[in-house]
Amino acid sequence: MMCNLLLSCSVLLLSCSHLLAHPVTDTADMTYSGPDSVEEAGGVNPDDFSVSDLNEHLQRAAVAGYSPLFSQENIKVPGQIPKEALRELLLEKPYRLIPPRGLWGSRRQFRKRGGGADCFWKYCI
C-alpha cells in the first residue's frame, strides 16, 4: 500500500517537472507588434477578386485534387439554401422540420392505480 502511494507520488512529480521547466510569461508585459490595420498587413479586399480569378483558383484546386468550396456553374458558398429549396422545405414538406418523435421521448399517460396505494401526482408507493 505504501509502495503504491510512493510510486504514484513519484510519477506525479516526474510528470510535473516538465511543466515547471517552461517559463510562465505574463501577457500584460508583452506588446503586440503586428500591423494596426488590414491595409498594413497586405490583406486582400474581397471586392478585388473577379470571376476570372475565382475560376483560376478553382481550376488550380481541381488540378491539385482538392474539392472546391465554390461551384463553377453557380457561385455559391456551401451552407446557403437557395430560395426554391427553402420554399419547398417550408411550404411543400413541412414534416421535414419536425424532428422524429423519438428525440423528444415518449409521452405515455400514467394511469391511476386501483386499491389503497398512496399516490402523489404520478408516483405511487
From Swiss-Prot:
Its main location: secreted. It is found in: Secreted. One of its GO terms (molecular function) is hormone activity. The lineage of its organism: Eukaryota, Metazoa, Chordata, Craniata, Vertebrata. Urotensin is found in the teleost caudal neurosecretory system. It has a suggested role in osmoregulation and as a corticotropin-releasing factor. The non-hormonal portion of this precursor may be a urotensin binding protein, urophysin. This is Prepro-urotensin II-gamma. Disulfide bonds join 119-124. It comes from the Eukaryota. PANTHER family: UROTENSIN 2, UROTENSIN-2. Belongs to the urotensin-2 family. GO terms for biological process: blood vessel diameter maintenance; regulation of blood pressure. The keyword Magnesium does not apply. GO terms for cellular component: extracellular region. Residues 1-21 form the signal peptide. Residues 109-111 form a propeptide. InterPro entries: Urotensin_II. Keywords: Cleavage on pair of basic residues, Disulfide bond, Hormone, Secreted, Signal.
